[in-house]
Amino acid sequence: VSSSIKYDEQKTEAAISELKCMQQENMTEPSDAHIEEKDDKFVIVPEQEGTALKPEKTSQDIIDALVTGRTPVDLEADGCYKEPKVYQSDETLTKNCELINKLTDVVITYDFDDCTETVDRDMIKNWLTTDENGLYTLDKKQIEAYISELAAKYDTVGTERTFNTYDGREITVSGGNYGWQIDQKAELKELTELIKNGETQVREPVYSHEGLVRKTNDIGYTYIEIDLTAQRMVFYKDGTPTADAQIVSGNPFVPNCATPVGCYTTGEMKSGCTVNGEDYPSAVNYWIPFDGNLGISDAPWRMDFGGQLYEFEGTHGSICAPSDQVQIIFSNVEKNTPVVIYE
């Protein structure tokens, strides 16, 4: 064919567009190599070349062959087929496959005593994002959200609790400082490092505040119960009433002196110390703090307890009781024991 051949451009392009190989239904688009999960691990699925043509390039290649007399027309050699963008040999793809297998090959079980929560492959794979280099990394916000959900489910400080009183009533108590609270910032760091290092383990989360019992009923069976209305305090050890005393609580008619209700926790106990009494510092034999400067103590200067004494001889908010009963409590409780106070 002479290079000076003349052709009708429109008719030629129309004829080319009607070729079988140019029909969309006869084309298979190429697919990129990618990562898939198979049999509990991630693998690279190779790219597929496909049979889809680049319309403009193909048309131009055929026209050029007509004009120049070039035969045969090798569309593949001439680069007319669409190509995958990512091949299985791609360095980033290879690194990502290694990374995702490492990051997800971890099982971390959170132990909450009577229930557990598990972080595993199915969860971690949804926590992955890519960095500025296109490589997989853990998404901090996703892990933060998970830990926040754990805290919402298992934190108990200040929450509303159903409580059975010494006289058989079922009441609701809320507020106070007793219970469990996850240190979300510290736990975010711990969980992230465990996943990155591939450390499978059973663990408790990092707590910023701990109670005595980690079960769903975190009051348990050893606790101090204070009924402000009856002016009575009962101490249970392992479910058995061990001390029972009439008390004098805070004076509710003096500003900031009412004993607060709620579920509190015992702090560092002291013996033979001085505390703020009703009107002046007073020496006590036993001191069991439960809320800042408030606590439970004996009151050697008092002869009477109970009744309505708290209304005109009340404390600044602390609880006073006879020495023999406070001594029993002092000798049997440990730090973080619940103190349930209600009216």
Regions found by a protein language model. Name each.
Residues 1-264, 268-282, 286, 333-335, ...:
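Surface-exposed, secretory/extracytoplasmic low-complexity segments enriched in Ser/Thr/Asn/Gly/Pro
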Residues 287-332, 337-340:
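Active-site scaffold segments
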